Amino acid sequence: MSGIVTYGSYIPRYRIRPEEIARVWGEDPEKMKNGIFILSKSVPGPDEDVATISVEAARNALKRSNIDPNDIGAIYIGSESHPYAVKPTATIVAAAIGMPFRTFAADYEFACKAGTAAMQNIKAMVDSNMIKYGMAIGSDTSQGAPGDALEYTASAGGTAMVIGRDNVIAEINKTISVATDTPDFWRREGEPYPKHGERFTGEPGYFKHVIGAARDIMSELNTKPDDYDYVVFHQPNGKFPTRAAKILGFREEQYREGLITPYIGNTYSGSTMTGLSAILDVSRPGDRILAVSFGSGAGSDAFDITVTDNILDYHRENAPGVRKMMESTEYIDYAVYSKFRKILVFGDNLE
């Protein structure tokens, strides 16, 4: 059976606390922090974007395995913040890691589930013998308008997953998707920041799709929450995934390991995949994982995954784990944050 052969993540080391953002905009710091259950969020450095984050995640994945990049036949990168409107991120990353000329490459978009959509397509290509291995990446330097609620959560990070049939460390037993036309969140071409339809964000958007996809895949597999050792959902904030888990009947010990948003914010396309990466960092043979992503617009991808015995010989230690990167931090104030995120616009002669 096909599944994850290796994986790697990258999280920028810079952080800003919600209290610092609230201070600038005259909001109640404790109210903002507790309202979204975010303690800090990651901030990309001035020289970091989706391409560099994806390269680092991909390299970390390759450090943990003996896979020759020439054997990777496809690379798909999901993101809301590709650095170019016309020029693929996938070709940049493919060149950086040494993939061959004969390569399937494309950038994906479906809000925050573009990365998991890439995983599904890579799995299908492996299963149909079109490729031996394929790499799916979910990565973002997400945007939030200054002073908007999204500014408190929109962060940066990404994860790469290589899928194949040889030396699989986590079998993908089944994957399904759900989708509807829901106007919960959007950004038009040329606009710097997204807008959100607040009344569509919760129940009609996130909860309908995440809970619906989770229930559908468990129904088809005849499983129940107690059959899983871990569960991870898309994490727009710290409260939505915990509420979804409780509605479905999961316990805190099942979702705690993959819940990373309180410490690094919402990495958008990287969110579910990085939460899954954190789980794989500590998983053991036989562990069963339910992963459900969410993308505004709207849709969810659900995965039923089983960790194999190959995890015992897998070199997780060759690249930093998610928790280690979460702990390697440098806090910045709003002035530096504004500079890094280019909120401050300089004249032509200034840098």
UniProtKB/Swiss-Prot annotation:
UniProt cross-references to CDD domains, sorted A to Z: init_cond_enzymes
Binding site for (3S)-3-hydroxy-3-methylglutaryl-CoA: D28, C112, T153, T201, H234, R243, N266, S296
Residues noted as binding CoA in the record, renumbered to the chain: R199, K239
Top EC class, one word: transferase
Keyword entries, A-Z: Acyltransferase, Isoprene biosynthesis, Transferase
Catalytic activity entry: acetoacetyl-CoA + acetyl-CoA + H2O = (3S)-3-hydroxy-3-methylglutaryl-CoA + CoA + H(+)
Molecular function terms, GO-annotated: acetyl-CoA C-acetyltransferase activity; hydroxymethylglutaryl-CoA synthase activity
GO biological process entries: farnesyl diphosphate biosynthetic process, mevalonate pathway; isopentenyl diphosphate biosynthetic process, mevalonate pathway
Acyltransferase found in the keyword field: yes
Active site (record annotation): E80 (proton donor/acceptor), C112 (acyl-thioester intermediate), H234 (proton donor/acceptor)
Record Pfam families: ACP_syn_III_C
Membership in a protein family: Belongs to the thiolase-like superfamily. Archaeal HMG-CoA synthase family.
Subunit structure of this chain's protein: Interacts with acetoacetyl-CoA thiolase that catalyzes the precedent step in the pathway and with a DUF35 protein. The acetoacetyl-CoA thiolase/HMG-CoA synthase complex channels the intermediate via a fused CoA-binding site, which allows for efficient coupling of the endergonic thiolase reaction with the exergonic HMGCS reaction.
Name under which the protein is recorded: Hydroxymethylglutaryl-CoA synthase
Organism: Picrophilus torridus (strain ATCC 700027 / DSM 9790 / JCM 10055 / NBRC 100828 / KAW 2/3)
